[in-house]
């Protein structure tokens, strides 16, 4: 699993690892929304993590991002069981995963760089920067209380990659 704050490079790293291991990726963006920073976990745990750990296919309803806010659920997805699956997204290496993950990776970058990456990601909309700043404060509080970074098996700093131009 790849955890870390928004804009840190989790998705980029997940794609690299997925390609290397020929493993599917489950994105936490299918569960989280701007209004649901950390409360998505019970649905993910029941529909995905517990199911896959039991050796069964995971069937879950993905978040609908067509309104840019992720305020509703959309299509149903099926992730066939696989010996290796990359789970990528904010707070996915939270305390509740202790003893349930093979490997936890913490991905990080300075806050200013993460915000800049967030501003070039996706489409522009009024209030985007304020949403990102609020989200980053929620992340800081969650990660401090959860002690997520200190439980990681490895820490990857993606500062060297800068801000994407496209």
Over which residues does each language-model region extend?
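P-loop (Walker A) phosphate-binding loop of NTP-binding proteins
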Residues: 5
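Conserved lysine of the Walker
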Residues: 10
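Hydrophobic anchor at the beta1->P-loop junction of P-loop NTPases
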Residues: 2
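Hydrophobic positions on the alpha1 helix immediately C-terminal to the Walker A/P-loop
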Residues: 13, 17
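Small-molecule kinase domains that catalyze NTP-dependent phosphoryl transfer to phosphate-bearing small molecules
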Residues: 94, 123-166
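Conserved AAA+ ATPase "sensor/coupling" helix adjacent to the nucleotide-binding pocket
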Residues: 47, 120-125
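ATP-dependent NMP and nucleoside kinases share a basic, alpha-helical "lid"
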Residues: 72-121
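Conserved nucleotide-sensing/catalytic segment adjacent to the nucleotide-binding pocket
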Residues: 24-87
């Amino acid at each position: 699993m790849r955890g870390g704050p928004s804009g840190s490079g989790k998705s980029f790293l997940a794609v690299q690892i997925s390609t290397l291991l020929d493993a599917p990726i489950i994105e936490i963006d299918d569960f989280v929304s701007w209004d649901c920073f950390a409360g998505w976990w019970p649905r993910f745990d029941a529909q995905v993590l517990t199911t896959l750990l039991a050796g069964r296919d995971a069937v879950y309803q993905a978040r609908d991002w067509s309104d840019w806010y992720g305020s509703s659920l959309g299509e149903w997805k099926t992730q066939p069981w696989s010996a290796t699956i990359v789970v990528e997204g904010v707070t996915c290496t939270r305390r509740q995963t202790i003893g349930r993950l093979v490997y936890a990776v913490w991905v990080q970058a300075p806050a200013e760089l993460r915000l800049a990456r967030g501003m070039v990601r996706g489409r522009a909309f009024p209030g985007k920067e304020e949403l990102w700043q609020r989200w980053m404060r929620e992340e800081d509080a969650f990660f401090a209380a959860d002690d997520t970074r200190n439980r990681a098996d490895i820490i990857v700093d993606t500062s060297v990659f800068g801000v994407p131009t496209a």
